[in-house]
Amino acid sequence: MNYKLFSPYTIKDVTLKNRIVMSPMCMYSSKNEDGQITNFHLIHYGTRAAGQVGLVMIEATAVLPEGRISNKDLGIWDDSLIEGLHKATTFIHDNGAKAAIQLAHAGRKAELETDALAPSAIPFNETMKMPIEMSKHQIKDTVLAFQQAAVRSKQAGFDVIEIHGAHGYLINEFLSPLTNKRTDEYGGSPENRYRFLREIIESINEVWNGPLFVRISANDYHPDGLTVQDYVQYTKWMKEQGVDLIDCSSGAVVPARIDVYPGYQVQYAKHIKEHANIATGAVGLITTGAQAEQILNNNEADLIFIGRELLRNPYFSRIAANELGFELEEPYQYERAPGKISTNK
């Protein structure tokens, strides 16, 4: 029997062998605080590739040193960082998966000794520092940094780029009226609040012709914040600009209580897919093969982003295949261990 979860998926000229994506998750493991890939990262990402994930996405990687969430984040702000990232893509490719990178700037959530930057001088909460409102010059420099990061991503051998526009980081801060109180062309109307992301996408398109994803927070979980319907318009603009897929997460732009349950964010992937007519990725407490297969069969999303479940078990793909009764092609090195495996939950 054929299963959609294990069917190929082609975006532009890149074909994923299945619909399982390793969701980007910060490991805070650049131990020398220089943004460099370490041996841990090679093992971490390579193991998930060997575990038969279709697309392995490297964690949020800062386009500027001051754009890191922490000083142990990965970086792509300098050519000296390309070599390490190329080792990672080679490791991933050699183990049978495609490689993606998430380009990011933490904005007001940067927990560094340097000043935090944001569209407006509003802290995330009472314990975090007051950010500095970005000047237009700083905005232009950041747009350029995303473009230069895309060039380095290409040189490092990545197949897919994802722009991190979610979770209350810099791009999300520009999009949301809760965090963007500017009165210039970068604030006010939805068109103006989208301008920063528009310029980033335009700049990346000048140097990158591969698949381009954007991760969004499709709900601010605040009465005065953005809802998934607001993001329908944003994603229509993204599609017009050539974005290929929307990775649908939610929350974290402001402190909020969120009702979390299995597949709680799938509704956003479905809504965006249906109303913006664009491919989507579903993420959030997707933990079994049956659950993932149902999402795809219901046409609620095109790709399944797996996060914590892949931290618990890097061989999630094999377990999902066994659960569904699908014969997954194994690395030849593992052929001596046939039969079912389980997580023993």
UniProtKB/Swiss-Prot annotation:
EC number: 1.6.99.1
Alphabetical GO biological process terms: response to toxic substance
Organism superkingdom: Bacteria
Pfam families: Oxidored_FMN
Record-listed substrate binding positions: Y28, H164, G165, A166, H167
Keywords: Detoxification, Flavoprotein, FMN, NADP, Oxidoreductase
Cofactor(s) recorded in Swiss-Prot or TrEMBL: FMN
Residues reported in the UniProt entry to bind FMN: S23, P24, M25, C26, A60, Q102, R215, G307, R308
Catalytic activity: A + NADPH + H(+) = AH2 + NADP(+)
Family matches, as Gene3D superfamilies: Aldolase class I
GO MF entry, a single one: FMN binding
SUPFAM superfamilies assigned: FMN-linked oxidoreductases (SSF51395)
Function: Catalyzes the reduction of the double bond of an array of alpha,beta-unsaturated aldehydes and ketones. It also reduces the nitro group of nitroester and nitroaromatic compounds. It could have a role in detoxification processes.
Family, per entry: Belongs to the NADH:flavin oxidoreductase/NADH oxidase family. NamA subfamily.
Matches recorded under NCBIfam families: PRK13523.1
Record's subunit section: Homotetramer.
PANTHER family in UniProt: NADPH DEHYDROGENASE C23G7.10C-RELATED
Protein's name according to its UniProt entry: NADPH dehydrogenase
Species this protein is from: Bacillus cereus (strain AH187)
Gene assigned in the entry: namA
